[in-house]
């Protein structure tokens, strides 16, 4: 698990299964590596740490030294966390593409909300799922108080909550990073990440920005 933030990394280390799970905390925002030459990539300490931890160097086609079958990106569920997760996805898509093609890269989906109903606990990924869950619970358990808590970040979650929502195989949610259309993926990521595409990005946001729920 590549985990955003030192405090969350500490909780994640307590939450993991030590037999087959490992934690790499990222301290600070990772470099936008989309336009960085691979020869200069490892000068970034965070990227160098990722490369050493997984056993694969940027641009490698040979994965025989890969240390983990699943590499999971674990960041906060808010917009800042999604930004960091996007930067890490861009790193793998651009410089560790073979890992993506072979299905080794995943994005963890931590909850943004916790819903307490009596002694029962439910988790929701986002606002829409929270509203849907509360609505179902109102029908299923009418008259019982529902308490909704919004997590400010992974560091606010206890090791037990992190284990249940992001690490236990039976209850966690993972999305595998895939490339279905290479040219489309390259163009989209270039538009999102390349500094030289500022004008295109601005135009895209003006046209499509109203389609996003903030």
What role is predicted for each listed range?
Residues 1-214:
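Conserved phosphate-chemistry cores used by DNA topoisomerases
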């Amino acid at each position: 698990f590549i985990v955003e933030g030192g405090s969350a990394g500490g909780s994640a280390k307590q939450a993991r299964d030590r037999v087959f799970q490992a934690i790499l905390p990222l301290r600070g925002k990772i470099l936008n590596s989309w336009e960085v030459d691979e020869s200069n990539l490892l000068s970034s300490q965070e990227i160098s740490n990722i490369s050493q931890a997984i056993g694969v160097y940027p641009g490698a086609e040979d994965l025989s030294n890969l240390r983990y079958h699943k590499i999971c990106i674990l960041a906060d569920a808010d917009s800042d966390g999604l930004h960091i997760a996007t930067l890490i996805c861009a790193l793998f898509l651009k410089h560790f593409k073979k890992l993506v093609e072979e299905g080794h890269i995943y994005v963890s989906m931590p909850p943004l909300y916790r819903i307490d109903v009596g002694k029962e606990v439910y988790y929701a990924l986002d606002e829409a799922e929270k509203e849907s869950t509360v609505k179902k619970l109102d029908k299923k358990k009418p008259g019982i108080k529902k308490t909704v808590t919004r997590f400010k970040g992974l560091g606010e979650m206890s090791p037990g909550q992190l284990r249940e929502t992001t690490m236990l195989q039976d209850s966690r949610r993972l999305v595998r990073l895939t490339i279905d259309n290479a040219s489309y993926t390259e163009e989209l990521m270039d538009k999102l990440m390349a500094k030289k595409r500022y004008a295109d990005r601005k135009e895209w946001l003006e046209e499509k920005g109203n389609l996003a729920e903030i």
